[in-house]
Curated annotation (Swiss-Prot):
It comes from Rattus norvegicus. Residues 88-93 are annotated as: Connecting peptide. This is Gamma-crystallin S. The keyword Acetylation applies. Keywords: Acetylation, Eye lens protein, Repeat. PROSITE patterns: CRYSTALLIN_BETA_GAMMA. Has a two-domain beta-structure, folded into four very similar Greek key motifs. Crystallins are the dominant structural components of the vertebrate eye lens. The modification N-acetylserine is found at S2. Residues 2-5 are annotated as: N-terminal arm. Belongs to the beta/gamma-crystallin family.
Length: 178
């Protein structure tokens, strides 16, 4: 295990069977080790795993735990190509400001809590910009923490492309808590 305690193991087959690839640091391309990935065991830390090499394609955030099949991490298929450890901010403080328009304009809402439905809580179907003031957060394309995921560290995001999205569709979000 790494100095930070972060460790993830990828398995070719379901239920932690078949060839295995262990990782304790960021890896831009592990396809040469595994042709497919059907199960994952996160033994330390929180990880972002990506569908393609170079941290691209669909991203999935995986906290410590066992994922015996790719549907458990809401994967679309058995293809993964890269991973990186998520570095959480220290102090356990969380605060985010979301805006209904780009460049921090329009109505602003501030929260320190998870939000399973932006429509129910803020009457928003889209978030066009945000400021992460404290903590690390995940935006989800759909309500109840489903759909494409976007990892947001402490900084300002003037438009959806700044957090890696093609559109402003964000309908739920939550803190990454270890």
């Amino acid at each position: 295990m790494s100095k930070t305690g972060a460790k993830i193991s990828f398995y070719e087959d379901r239920n932690f069977q078949g060839r295995r690839y262990d990782c304790d640091c960021d890896c831009v391309d592990f396809r040469s080790y595994l042709s497919r990935c059907n199960s994952i065991r996160v033994e330390g830390g929180t990880w972002a795993v990506y569908e393609r090499p170079n941290f691209s394609g669909h991203m999935y955030i995986l906290p410590q735990g066992e994922y015996p099949e790719y549907q458990r991490w809401m994967g679309l298929n058995d293809r993964l190509g890269s991973c990186r450890a998520v570095h959480l901010s220290s102090g356990g403080q969380y605060k985010i400001q979301i805006f209904e328009k780009g460049d921090f304009s329009g109505q602003m809402y501030e929260t320190t809590e998870d939000c399973p439905s932006t429509m129910e809580r803020f009457h928003l179907r889209e978030i066009h910009s945000c400021k992460v003031l404290e903590g690390t957060w995940i935006f989800y394309e759909l309500p109840s923490y489903h759909g494409r995921q976007y990892l947001l560290d402490k900084k300002e995001y003037r438009k959806p492309v700044d957090w890696g999205a093609a559109s402003p569709a964000v309908q739920s979000f939550r803190r990454i808590v270890e």
